[in-house]
A protein has these predicted regions:
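Conserved GNAT-fold acetyl-CoA-binding loop/helix
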Residues: 18-43
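A short helix-loop-beta-strand connector motif used in the catalytic cores of GNAT acetyltransferases and
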Residues: 43-55, 82
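Conserved GNAT acetyl-CoA-binding A-motif
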Residues: 110-120
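Conserved beta-strand in the GNAT
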Residues: 55, 61-70
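A short beta-loop-alpha structural element at the N-terminal edge
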Residues: 5-17
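Conserved active-site alpha-helix within GNAT-family acetyltransferase domains
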Residues: 99, 123-141, 147
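Conserved acetyl-CoA pyrophosphate-binding loop and the N-cap/start of the following alpha-helix
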Residues: 92, 96-104
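Conserved acetyl-CoA binding element of GNAT-fold acetyltransferases
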Residues: 78-90
Length: 158
């Protein structure tokens, strides 16, 4: 019987992390937006400690990952764990591994005393939305906005 385990990523995993980021972006039909490099991952995750990565392993084979970071809730007066990326290899889906990864992250939130566990999901991704709702997650009436590239530079330099 297969056993799912987890391990924290280390600096030797930057290539694997970037590979999973690209796989997720491809699934989301946004691969052309990925400009991150191994050096970026090394710098922000392992040198500046701005994010953490956990791998899911089936019988010692890495089959998925989660990348997360902290945000702050002024309403709660506490930090939130923000899940940026979650990806399970397609051939391993349907085995409860996505739920197990979310359970692992929820335990981190509880054990570390954080205030909330949050993430975003593309509006077209109905299978994931239905899955999250089945876990008791609530959709909030928020819109996510991004400023990058020229628009960011323009605002910064007006």
């Amino acid at each position: 019987m297969s056993q799912l385990t987890f391990r924290n990523a280390d600096e030797n995993d930057v290539g694997l992390i970037l590979e999973f980021i690209r796989k997720l972006a491809d699934y989301e039909k946004r691969l052309d937006e990925v400009v991150a490099t191994e050096d970026d991952i090394r710098k922000w995750v392992f040198e500046k400690h701005q994010a953490e990565v956990i791998f899911a392993l089936e019988d010692d084979k890495v089959i998925g990952f989660a990348l997360f970071f902290l945000s702050f809730s002024t309403y709660l007066g506490n930090v939130n764990l923000h899940l940026e990326d979650l990806f399970i290899e397609p051939e391993y889906r349907g085995n409860g591994y996505g739920k197990a990864m979310l359970k692992k992250l929820a335990k981190i939130v509880v054990d570390r005393g954080y205030g909330r566990f949050e993430w975003t999901c593309l509006s077209w991704n109905k299978p994931s939305i239905d899955f999250y709702l089945s876990l008791g997650a609530k959709q909030k009436d928020w819109n996510v906005f991004h400023l990058t590239g020229r628009e960011l530079e323009k605002l910064a330099n007006e």
